[in-house]
Regions:
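Intrinsically disordered, low-complexity segments enriched in Gly and acidic/Ser/Thr residues
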Residues: 190-236
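Extended, low-hydrophobicity segments enriched in charged/polar residues
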Residues: 1-209
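Alpha-helical oligomerization segments
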Residues: 226-266
Length: 266
């Protein structure tokens, strides 16, 4: 496997795949990310979503797409002989990295959308995913005025803030030795035998967000002493962090992070 130029290769060098063996024993299969149990506590950090400053728009992504098709301003989506537009809905959702879209948009908290729609932030028995907020969508498609969370990756701002909070809560601070793992699915699903694992300092972990060849934040990040583990599942809109009660309380009280306890996914 080829290495990136510095600073990634010097600050976060590749290490053996066996570094994940303990996670395999603890969590089971890590194809979409090693999902840890509480250690002894846990919390879910929610991926960010955004809304146009002028508020809600009744037009959905799917309606907008079909209007463009009718006007001839976009081409039909096909796979072989299959017309995807005839059998699918343009939801507005995405996959992978995300960040604040810039002027004209604001972050929309899950708690605010829950109050607006009457939907729970995360329905009982579920995890943060595309199944949340059915009342916000029209026939499965989000309003064009909203940018829903992406699957499989933290947004950049939340990732950076997590690094800050994790650094503040450990005895070694930013010098905490950590390891990071990317699911094969986040690397193009081309190599399922040689797992991509890197080791470095927590204080240098912002670099990991921009790993060449991946459009995702790490699937797992954990302290080398195994005091905490972070998992961003490829199919979900949130990241589970397992660790001490003090760490979990710090995350729940961080104003830059939106975090919730999910007793059924503890």
């Amino acid at each position: 496997m080829s290495e990136e130029p510095n600073p990634m290769s010097s600050l976060w060098p590749l290490v053996r795949s066996g570094a994940t063996d303990w996670l395999l024993e603890l969590c089971g299969d890590g194809l979409t990310g090693f999902m840890p149990p509480a250690m002894p506590d846990a919390v879910w950090v929610l991926n960010s979503m955004y809304e146009h400053n002028q508020g809600s728009n009744e037009v959905s992504y799917d309606e907008h797409h079909r209007a463009r098709l009718a006007a001839g301003s976009t081409q039909p989506r096909t796979v072989g002989a299959i017309d995807l537009d005839a059998v699918s809905v343009t939801t507005g959702g995405g996959l992978g990295r995300a960040r604040h879209p810039g002027p004209g948009r604001r972050r929309l908290r899950w708690a605010e959308l829950a109050r607006r729609t009457g939907d729970p932030m995360v329905p009982d028995g579920l995890m943060p995913s595309h199944r949340c907020f059915p009342s916000a969508k029209k026939k499965g498609s989000w309003p064009l005025s909203m940018i829903p969370p992406t699957e499989g990756s933290l947004d950049r701002e939340t990732w950076n803030q997590l690094i800050v909070t994790l650094s503040q809560c450990g005895p070694e601070g930013p010098d905490t030795r950590c390891l990071a793992y990317w699911s094969p699915l986040s690397l193009g699903a081309t190599d399922f035998d040689n797992l991509h694992v890197r080791a470095g300092r927590l204080g240098d972990a912002e670099l990991l967000y921009d790993l060449s060849g991946a459009d995702f934040s790490p699937s797992n990040l954990w302290a080398d002493d195994r005091s905490w583990v972070l998992c961003t599942d490829y199919d979900l809109w949130g990241t589970k962090i397992a660790g001490s009660p003090a760490l979990i309380d710090a995350l729940l009280n961080d104003p830059e992070i939106e975090a919730v306890r999910l007793p059924w996914a503890h």
